[in-house]
Structure formats: C-alpha cells, structure tokens
Amino acid sequence: FPLVLSAARLGSIKPGNAVTYREVKVGEVTGYELGQTADRVLIRVLIEPRYAALVHTGSRFWETSGFGVDFSLFKGASVRTDSLESLIEGGVAFATPDGEQMGRRALPGQTFALFKEPQEEWFGWAPKIELGRAASDK
C-alpha cells in the first residue's frame, strides 16, 4: 500500500528504514525525490497490505531517527527514544486518532506531512481498527 510523505528536508531517512505503528514494523521507506518545485522532499513508503487499514486521512507521521532530550529545571531530564532499531537506523512512525478525527481510509499514493517530532497527544490515540489478512495467513 504505497504512500508519500512530504518533508522540508530528508534528514536521516533512507530506503529500507522501518515504518512503525505502536513500535511494530508495518512497512518501510522505499525511496525519495525532490518535489516538482524542489521545495519539499517526497519520501515514498510502502505499508504492508495487512496493515493498510491503519492509515486514515487523520493519521500523523513523524521521524523516529535518533533520540530527544527534554531538560527542565523542575522536572529533571526526560529522554525520548523509539525502538532500538529506529534509534540506530532512523525511520518513520505514525499514529491514527479515534472517532471523527480518524477520517476516511487513506487512498494508495496519498500524501501526508512528515513531522520532525510527534505531539504528545498522538501517543494517547488508540483506535480499534480491524486489520486485513496477509496472503500468508490464508
């Protein structure tokens, strides 16, 4: 199930990087190119067919490369990392909201913005979405 992610810069993303949903690999980056007017990078990803139902018009994608550190005088330091694989390799993660925010199922080839980092609320999204069957499950 092909999708396109649009970003200002490529960053550390490269073909073969994982695309994850809830830290489970559901696809991978297949390539990239400059957009038609060279002001964006278009990153091609392929979601495994059985996981295509996870992607809706309200889904949000973000980079998982590296780790983030947030330091506050009163809170101490908090470190944000994704899976060890994405920490080393980089990659893309996404989340899909509940209810009306979810929107319709994405269409093949649909374009989504790729955010540099996630918003905290995205981690709280937990819609129940029926998954498709992979050909190997039959």
Describe these PLM feature segments.
Residues 1-138:
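Extracytoplasmic/periplasmic terminal helices and flexible tails
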